[in-house]
């Protein structure tokens, strides 16, 4: 049965399906022509475990699947899987979207909204999302719940390439992918060392993407949900979470493996990035990235601004003078300073400051080749890891 809808919050979507009062987790999966992957993706949900390896109660979660514009056997495979696993609460909607809506941003938003409203009927819970070409770990749900119970508002899981498919990726593409991963992991390590964010300590990673992401209904509601974008909705949503100072945990214990295909289902995504790296190899061009010096400069300044923001209501020292000292390289004005004092969220204010900062940093620190950046980042990690290293106080 096909469902037609025009608004992301259309209450008719999935409304015909019963909701067990025990459900506290809803997983959403968008599907478009995933006949080669969807069965592997779904199979692991029938054998989810807790963190000790004991079977997870299937009554505690359900899976919402929106199959849109499929021209292959994806829907048949899903329905067949449903019949073979009647105890697994899989809710399937099938639709053909018009061109303006036939994009991953719209579909993911529709799914997340549906999950949010269903969970709110049960008093709230956790919305989780993955993809139709991705296989989650057996303890994926449990490890996510553990991170949220520890205080996180949202959890980004570690997304790895499917080992069986890596052998089919050309060596240059895999080479660049590995180096790019190392680059971002080193940045994540520096963020941990410099910012010392209590809810996202080392070991941590850099991914907060659709292959493995979770958010509490409370945080989802406060953030305003996923913005109206055609793609990269995960990045847009993460920005919204940053704006409300959400506690986002990048956990290595939450793991998935995703397809290494280079022909994807969205305009921009991992498959798109793999193709970019492949073309760089064909053209023998170097991958240019932000330099270690720029990254450290940005992180140290952000740390100092966070410290100042936390004491901005104090009267025992000159806030304005300290603010100007921290931001001396950045052209700030009185309006930006006053918004710093009054903003309810640091992240909301910092998003405005960051735009000004990026202009200056691009001029001061030219982009560098990836190999050099890796060398420099490793040096910075050693420096900031030293027990004797003393961070400069804003006071």
Summary of predicted features, one role per range:
Residues 1-59:
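N-proximal low-complexity "stem/linker" segments adjacent to membrane-targeting elements
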Residues 35, 64-77, 97-99, 134:
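A conserved acidic beta->alpha catalytic loop
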Residues 139-180:
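Conserved donor NDP-sugar-binding/catalytic core segment of glycosyltransferases
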Residues 276-395:
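Terminal low-complexity segments of carbohydrate-biosynthetic enzymes
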């Amino acid at each position: 049965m096909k469902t037609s809808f025009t608004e992301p919050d259309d209450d008719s979507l999935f409304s015909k399906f019963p909701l067990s009062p025990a459900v506290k987790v809803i997983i959403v999966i968008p599907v478009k022509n995933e006949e080669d992957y969807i069965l592997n993706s779904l199979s692991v949900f029938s054998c989810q475990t807790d963190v000790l390896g004991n079977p997870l109660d299937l009554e505690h979660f359900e899976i919402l699947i929106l199959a849109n514009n499929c021209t292959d056997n994806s829907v048949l495979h899903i329905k067949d899987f449903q019949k073979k696993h009647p105890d697994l609460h899989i809710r399937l909607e099938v639709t053909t979207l018009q061109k303006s809506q036939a994009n991953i941003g719209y579909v993911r938003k529709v799914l997340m909204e549906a999950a949010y409203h269903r969970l709110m009927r049960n008093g709230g819970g956790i919305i989780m999302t993955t993809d139709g070409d991705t296989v989650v770990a057996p303890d994926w749900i449990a490890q996510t719940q553990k991170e949220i119970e520890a205080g996180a508002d949202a959890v980004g899981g570690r997304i790895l390439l499917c080992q069986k498919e890596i052998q089919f990726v050309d060596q240059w593409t895999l080479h660049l992918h590995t180096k790019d991963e190392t680059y971002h992991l080193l940045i994540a390590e520096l963020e941990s060392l410099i910012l010392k964010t209590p809810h996202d300590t080392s070991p941590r990673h850099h991914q907060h993407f659709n292959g493995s992401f979770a958010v509490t209904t409370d945080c989802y509601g406060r953030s305003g949900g996923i913005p109206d974008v055609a793609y990269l909705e995960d990045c847009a949503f993460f920005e919204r979470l940053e704006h409300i100072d959400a506690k986002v945990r990048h956990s290595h214990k939450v793991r998935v493996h995703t397809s290494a295909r280079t022909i994807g289902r969205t305009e921009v995504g991992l498959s798109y990035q793999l193709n970019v790296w492949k073309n760089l190899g064909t053209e023998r061009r170097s991958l240019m990235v932000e330099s270690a010096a720029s990254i450290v400069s940005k992180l140290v300044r952000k740390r100092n601004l966070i410290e100042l923001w936390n004491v901005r209501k104090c009267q025992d020292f000159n806030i304005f003078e300290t603010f100007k000292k921290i931001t001396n390289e950045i052209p700030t004005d009185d309006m930006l300073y006053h918004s710093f004092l009054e903003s309810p969220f640091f992240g909301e204010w910092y998003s405005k400051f960051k735009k000004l900062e990026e202009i200056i940093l691009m001029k001061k620190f030219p982009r560098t080749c990836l190999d050099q950046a890796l060398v420099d980042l490793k040096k910075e990690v050693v420096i900031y890891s030293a027990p004797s290293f003393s961070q400069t106080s804003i006071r």
